[in-house]
Structures are given as structure tokens and as C-alpha cells.
Amino acid sequence: MSLPFLASFKKTVAKLDTVGVGIQKTESWLSTGNYALNRALSGDFMRGIPVGKVTLFAGPSGSGKSFIAGNLCLEAQREGFHVLYLDSEHAIDVDYLGKIGVNVNDDALTYISVTTIEDVNSVLSEFFSNYTKTYGKDNTTAPKTLIVLDSLAMLSSATEMENYAKDGIIKSDQGILAKRRKAMLRLAVGQLGRLPIGMVLTDHVYPQDIMMGDGSWAITNSTKFSSSIIGIITKLKLKEEAEVIGVKMKFETYKSRFAKLGTKVTLEVPYNKGMSSFSGLVELLEEMGVIAKGTQIGEKLLWVTEVNGEIIKFKEKDLDKATAEKILKHPLCAPMMARNSVPEVSIEEIDAVTDQDEVPQLDTEALIKKSRKVKLTTE
């Protein structure tokens, strides 16, 4: 039943600075630049992090959180976003950002060094205030922005800094820190919902007491409740013979309103060129039952699948965008993609696959027979 005063009521409350009227759907996404990571975050190979919400990458020191943040800056700039980078670690690697293609000029990336939670509050308040004065709320034509805060764990409080200046001793009150961090995140979440702005946080995680718990990583409650998506990253060294040439990381979906929890992907991020779009994709597609191991040619393994009647055969090192996007039209991939991007697959086919308890296994033997007369798709 409609109430007669609703029209004027909505018009009045819409004028309030901190109020929004109407349900906001997540319609804008920013790709991470990596298909497997996209899928783990959003349940969709083509989408990555949601605009208008908070995404958290958490992990132990040196796990690669800042590398992921750097790649997101690159993808954001490719999509026309401005990047606001808040750095509490004071360790941003401009050379690395330049190597992977991030534009660090002021017109493309605004870099601000912060020390305390109060610093972040002031910066965000000023930015949101100026943004809404210039473009208003719910403005679909306003320029998009990505805010990166790297990292939450290194932020102190103004009280800590005052005590240090007075006594030369760092006195940390975790209770005060937690409350102020929570207030800062409330401010961000409240503003982001009506603006074309995405926010990425990095944070440390801490091992729980193995004697009292399961030995898994612990995430602070303030970030757990304010983030729409949380991924936990752990690190391996990426080596070429004995030389360490980058970061090899394991990513696991800890929280997501859009994807299956517990999804795991392994990603490689070389120092000299950043993350490949295809890193982790072959392993994920094999796990899903989308592709199968075909024949061996020398030391190289061929992978095969069949999509819409077409046999697709490729070597992992030769996988390219055109081949990957053909494979991602496979019905088993369709539930994880925007349906309007895969018109060849009917809704009935998607539902039939989604409703199955187990992923159907590929008939590898039949596929190999069919593929013998087919040239490599990537040739």
C-alpha cells in the first residue's frame, strides 16, 4: 500500500547531507586485471571490486597486498578513474608503479602521506565534501575515483603521537585505536554508497592462538564488518632458478556478498611487469571442470575444452585474451559472469549447471580424439 505523503517525504529527506533515498544496486565494477582474482572476489571473471563499497586485502607482512593495490591503481586509470592514494607505510615504490604502467603524475594519482587515523578522517572528510559539492550525490556522470589506503595496520592515533611528543614513549591503547578506526570506516562506508568511488584497504592479519583456536588468521572486527569483500593473502617466493623475481601469493575469499567463500587462487606477480591477466586461470578452470589436460608435446602440456561446439586447444604459456574469453563462455563459467555477456548460453542451461550438486567431469578421452585434427587455438 502506497502512502500519499511519500513523494514529498522523499524529496525532503533527499536534501539531507548524510541521507540517501532508494536502494543502490552495485552496477559499477573495477577489474583487478586478473581473471582468476576477479572470480574469487566477485564471482565473475570479468568483474573485480565493487565501486561504492569497501574491499579489504589482508595478509601478513610482505605477502603482496601493496602489489595488488598497485595493479588496481593501473586498472583504475585504464578505466578513467582518478586514484587517491593514502600511504601510512611511507614505502610506496614509485619505480614499481612506473614499471607496471601506473601514471604517477598529479593529474592521474593524488598521493598523500598519513600517520594517524585522524589524518585519514580529515583527508576523507575534505575529499567527500568537495566531491559532493562539485558533483552532488547519485550523479552517474560524475568522474569515478579509487581510494587506496595502504595500510590500516600502520595508523596510530593522535593521542599516541601526543604522548610520544611529550614523554618520548609510545603508549598504545588498542581500545582507543579500535574505536577510532571503526569511526573512520563508518564515515567512509556512509559516503561511498551514494558516490562512484571505490575504496581499497590493506591490513595485516594475525595468527590466532593455535592452542585455543584453529590456527587461522584473525581479522579485526571493524574491518570485517565494514568491508563488502575481504581476501586473505599469504606469500610464497616467485623464483627463476635461485633468483627471487617476484611474489607468488595464495589468495582466499574470506568474505564476499558476491562470490563463494573459501575460493582459492594462486597468483604470480613479477617485480618487473606486474600481474598477468591469466595468472592462476588455468588451475582454476581445471578445478571447475572447464578444461582438461590433453596431449603432451615435448615438455609442454596442451589443454583442451569444447565450448558451443568448438574445440579449443592451447598451451598455458600461449593463452591470450581472445582464447580466454572464448573459454569463459563455457556453461560452467556462466554463473560467475554477467548473463548479458554470454548470450550463447540460455538461462535454463545456466540454472541446470548451477543446480547440480557436483561439477560434471569432462570426457577427456573424447575431447583428445576430437582435438587431434584441430590446430592450436592460440597459433
Located regions from the model:
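C-terminal regions of RecA-like/P-loop NTPase motor modules
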Residues: 1-20, 30, 238-379
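The Walker A/P-loop phosphate-binding site
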Residues: 2-106, 121-129, 133
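Residue-level preference for the first positions of well-ordered beta-strands
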Residues: 54-56, 82, 144-148, 198
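A short alpha->loop->secondary-structure connector
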Residues: 78, 100-108, 163-174, 216-220
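Catalytic P-loop NTPase motifs of RecA-like helicase/translocase cores
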Residues: 92, 155-156, 208-209
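A glycine-rich helix N-cap at a beta->alpha junction
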Residues: 105-118
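Phosphate-binding/switch loop-helix module in NTP-utilizing enzymes
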Residues: 115-194
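Phosphate-binding/switch region of NTP-binding enzymes
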Residues: 173-288
